[in-house]
Structures are given as structure tokens and as C-alpha cells.
Amino acid sequence: MRTKIAVFATTVLAALAVGGPSLAHHGFAAYSSESVTVQATLIELRFVNPHVQLYFDVKNTDGELEHWQAELTAPNKLARGGWTQHTLKPGDQIQISGQVARNGGHSIRIREIVTATGESLSLREVLD
């Protein structure tokens, strides 16, 4: 009986130890609550697990190129929303709306992407 209790207690403690960091991984505290919109040129779309990665260039107010990145949701969620690895391609001109990193880094939590043709690739529909 003591062995069963010890195994149960160890399992619960392990779950609690791992649970906190995994929830923090999916938190958005690192991003500002203020929305911004940037004009960007897509450099690369990595349609990979566990999260799709988007790399793009943005011209700052001085006209200099800044290299930005964003992490989207899982590829299977985007696929259910109609996305494929070919939805966006390098060189595409896109408008990105979302919340930027609080630390001033060139990272953004994307809420919507608008293509040069005006097509809206909303992530709200995919995530809801």
C-alpha cells in the first residue's frame, strides 16, 4: 500500500513540476497588449511541429531592414483552417497585425495577415 501511495505522490509531483512550464510556454505575457500593424516581406515559412515559424523583414522608420519572427499555432490547426506550406511564399508582401514583444525584440504574436491581394488570413478563426 505504501508503494502505491509513493508512486501516486511521485506522479502528482512530476505532473505539477512539468505542468507549470508547459502552461507558461503557451502564455502570452511576453507580448504587449497594444496592437500594431507592420508591412513586411516574407523570408521563410516553416510549416513544422510543434509550431509554424514565420520569418519576415520589416523596414523601420529609418528605412533600415529589421529581421522579425513569429511563432504561429501547430501546423495541423492551420491546416484545418485551410493553410498549407504554400499559403505564403518567400518574397510575398504581407501586412501583419498583432502584439509585439514587450522586451523590444523583433517578435510578434500574429492575429491577422493580409496578403498583397487583400486576402485576410485571420488566425482568430483558426484558434477559436
Positions of predicted regions on the chain:
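Bacterial N-terminal signal peptides that target proteins for export
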Residues: 1-9
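Short nucleic-acid-contacting surface segments enriched for D/E, G, S/T with interspersed K/R
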Residues: 79-96
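OB-fold/S1-family single-stranded nucleic acid-binding modules
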Residues: 101-124
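Conserved hydrophobic positions within beta-strands
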Residues: 40-42
